[in-house]
């Protein structure tokens, strides 16, 4: 399973660590990530609020699940963007 984690803080670090322990996780990406997260995931230089670029990345890299860790993208509607493209995403919708 390919996983994309959106964010760059302590919450996303904990998520990356947890996902890395799963035998089902073949590849983990984090956007934008940080040096600590890079121990567990490949960091991608896409900002957490760049919804279209993140969704494009998920499609192009055949991401099986995207986990949204940061609050601002959730409030901004990132889950709605991913779902509108048929992408699997974990997080609440904007409305």
Task: Report the location of each language-model feature.
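ATP-binding N-terminal substructure of ATP-dependent carboxylate-amine bond-forming enzymes
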Residues: 1-95
């Amino acid at each position: 399973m390919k996983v994309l984690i959106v964010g760059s803080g302590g919450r996303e670090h904990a998520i990356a660590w947890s996902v890395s322990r799963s035998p089902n996780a073949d590849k983990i990406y984090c956007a934008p990530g940080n040096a600590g997260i890079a121990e567990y995931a490949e960091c991608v230089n896409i900002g957490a609020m760049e919804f279209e670029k993140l969704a494009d990345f998920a499609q192009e890299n055949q991401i099986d699940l995207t986990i949204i860790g940061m609050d601002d993208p959730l409030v901004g509607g990132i889950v709605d963007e991913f779902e509108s493209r048929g992408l699997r995403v974990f997080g609440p919708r904007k409305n």
